[in-house]
């Protein structure tokens, strides 16, 4: 099986063409391939499939390193767009894809940056999903003897975002896994630790569901800005600084789609016998 290794700001992926190759991945096989000592090593596996809808270009599947399938990965979406062009699966600069939960438009710029229409952030608890009687801008969660104030939003996957004074010393290793598996998130959640530098600039670390802390999380950056906008902490154009690099997020507020722009890097191509 042929594959490519790619990354979006250090969030790394094994990308597989299932349009021209016949492939099947069990959770056990994905876990083996994800192992950084004995496999390929990656945060997520991205699989390019033929479209289920003839009006779309591709179907986009995402698997975490633990073998679980998820419905959204923003950094992965940018790599997906670069991959299908690099491999000659399309020459379009505007690429339409379906995911587990909806549709996305991926736009490749002249300098090979990728702008992703991530859709409108959804704050309804039942959509996230999150156990709450009604939608609030802020919730109180208790975890590991800590009381946490956070915002909760779906970007096609569940996110919990808390504001911290200094992201460099945030206790991500402790609070990340505890909140990821909090009883109020029936499908677990991605946990964002956001430092507001100014109304146009945040620093962010994300503990990803099923992957742990990563160098960057595109949907996590989108979620942090969405929460920051509704809490009136941020303007509509925000520079998001992550450990692996920076993204630009634009959101005009409720009723509008959110846009994420950033790089996607091809590292190497490989072949593996399964």
Curated annotation (Swiss-Prot):
Q: Which organism is it from?
A: Yersinia pestis
Q: What class of enzyme is it?
A: isomerase
What are the catalytic residues? 73 (proton donor), 217 (proton acceptor)
Name any one Pfam family assigned in the record: DAP_epimerase
Q: Which domain of life does the UniProt lineage start with?
A: Bacteria
Protein name as catalogued: Diaminopimelate epimerase
Tell me one GO molecular function of this protein.
Answer: diaminopimelate epimerase activity
Q: What is its EC number?
A: 5.1.1.7
């Amino acid at each position: 099986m042929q594959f490519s290794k790619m990354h979006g700001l250090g969030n790394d992926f094994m990308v597989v063409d299932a349009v021209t190759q016949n492939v099947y991945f069990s959770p056990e096989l994905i876990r083996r391939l994800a192992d950084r000592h004995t496999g390929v090593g990656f945060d997520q596996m991205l699989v390019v499939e033929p479209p289920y809808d003839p009006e779309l270009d591709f179907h986009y599947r995402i698997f975490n390193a633990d073998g679980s399938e998820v419905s959204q990965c923003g950094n992965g979406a940018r790599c997906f767009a670069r991959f299908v062009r690099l491999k000659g699966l399309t020459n379009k600069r505007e690429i339409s894809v379906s995911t587990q939960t909806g549709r996305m438009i991926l736009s490749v710029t002249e300098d090979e940056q990728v702008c992703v229409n991530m859709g409108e952030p959804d704050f309804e608890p039942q959509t996230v999903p999150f156990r709450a009687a009604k939608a609030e801008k802020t919730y109180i969660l208790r975890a590991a003897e800590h009381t946490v104030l956070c915002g909760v939003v779906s970007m096609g996957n569940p996110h919990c975002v808390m504001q911290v004074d200094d992201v460099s010393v945030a206790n991500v290793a402790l609070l990340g896994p505890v909140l990821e598996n909090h009883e109020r998130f029936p499908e677990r959640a991605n946990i964002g630790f956001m430092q507001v530098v100014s109304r146009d600039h945040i620093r962010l670390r994300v503990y990803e569901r099923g992957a742990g802390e990563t160098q960057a999380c595109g949907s996590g950056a989108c979620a942090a800005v969405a929460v920051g906008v509704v809490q009136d902490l941020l303007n509509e154009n925000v520079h998001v600084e992550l450990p692996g690099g920076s993204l630009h997020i634009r959101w005009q507020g409720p009723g509008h789609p959110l846009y994420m722009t950033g790089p996607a890097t091809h590292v190497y191509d490989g072949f593996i016998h399964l």
